[in-house]
């Protein structure tokens, strides 16, 4: 179709009378294209950032799940390790108790043997003295009888009878003296036996407390079991036992709900392995020396009854 060229005034008239409509330019400017390009780039970056954000969220979720699994695994491992340590502690405590029981049996057997030995020695001494006095009595009696024969049968018989009566009275006195002496020997040896037993016990306890560092923990546990009401607790121990007891502080608090507040201090007057526990209601003495005093008292009572 041939193109028709119009002058500008003619074009204006045609537009004016709506015979012609001038359309907008079909070509966009370079500036608009650049802006649209920038908008596209921004939208692309936003899309990429959204994808990266989603990836980070997914990664965070995976990390949280992995962390939860690790925490659960660690919890199980802690429970297993705690159970193992408790079993070890129980086994060690049983070993210590068994060793102490064996030592106590040995001490008792040694004490009985010592007592029987002393009784045997004292009986032998009494028998020896009795034999000596018996021989002397026989000799005196024979002399008296011989003398009586020399002075006449009748007179000698009476004299011999009187001498025999004197000898018998003397024999009764000697026997009473021997019985009293035997009783004195047994009473004096009883103290020696108790002293010997306690010396051996002290050596045994010292050897056990030196080799078994957690004896003090067993003592603390046993005392805390005897506390029935909620209270503030102060545990006093030897300096050598201070660290091991403080290390178990949280364990004591979790195991014994009677503890309102727990303090652990050093006391130079307490021997290794022992403790004194103070509460709002008084103190409980679990020192090794105090326990040995009770054992000594029981041995003394046993001796007196025997």
Curated annotation (Swiss-Prot):
GO CC terms in record: cytosol
GO biological process: bacterial-type flagellum organization; protein transport
The organism's place on the tree of life at top rank: Bacteria
Primary site of residence: cytoplasm
Subcellular localization, as worded in the UniProt entry: Cytoplasm
Keywords: Bacterial flagellum biogenesis, Bacterial flagellum protein export, Cytoplasm, Protein transport, Transport
Pfam families from the UniProt entry: FliH
InterPro entries: Flagellar_FliH/T3SS_HrpE (IPR018035), T3SS_Stator/FliH (IPR051472)
Family per record: Belongs to the FliH family.
Reported function: Needed for flagellar regrowth and assembly.
Name of the molecule in the record: Flagellar assembly protein FliH
């Amino acid at each position: 179709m041939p193109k028709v060229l119009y002058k500008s005034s003619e074009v204006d008239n045609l537009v004016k009378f709506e015979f012609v409509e001038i359309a907008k330019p079909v070509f966009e400017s370079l500036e608009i294209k650049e802006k649209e390009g920038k908008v596209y780039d921004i939208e692309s970056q936003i899309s990429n950032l959204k994808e990266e954000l989603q990836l980070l969220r997914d990664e965070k979720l995976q990390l949280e799940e992995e962390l939860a699994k690790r925490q659960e695994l660690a919890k199980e491992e802690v429970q297993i390790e705690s159970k193992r340590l408790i079993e070890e502690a129980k086994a060690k405590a049983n070993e210590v108790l068994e060793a102490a029981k064996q030592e106590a049996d040995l001490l008792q057997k040694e004490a009985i043997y010592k007592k029987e030995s002393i009784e045997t020695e004292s009986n032998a001494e009494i028998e020896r003295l009795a034999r000596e006095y018996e021989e002397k009595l026989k000799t005196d009696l024979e002399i008296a009888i011989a003398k009586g024969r020399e002075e006449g049968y009748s007179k000698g018989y009476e004299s011999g009878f009187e001498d025999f009566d004197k000898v018998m009275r003397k024999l009764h006195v000697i026997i009473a003296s021997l019985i009293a002496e035997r009783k004195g020997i047994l009473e004096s040896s009883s103290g020696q036996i108790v002293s010997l037993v306690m010396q051996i016990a002290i050596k045994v306890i010292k050897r056990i407390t030196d080799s078994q560092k957690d004896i003090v923990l067993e003592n603390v546990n046993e005392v805390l079991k005897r506390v029935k009401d909620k209270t503030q607790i102060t545990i006093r121990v030897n300096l050598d036992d201070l660290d091991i007891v403080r290390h178990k502080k949280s364990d004591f608090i979790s195991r014994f709900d009677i503890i309102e507040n727990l303090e652990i201090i050093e006391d130079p007057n307490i021997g290794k392995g022992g403790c004194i526990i103070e509460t709002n209601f008084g103190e409980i003495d679990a020192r090794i020396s105090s326990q040995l005093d009770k054992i000594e008292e029981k041995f003394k009572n046993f001796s007196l009854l025997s």
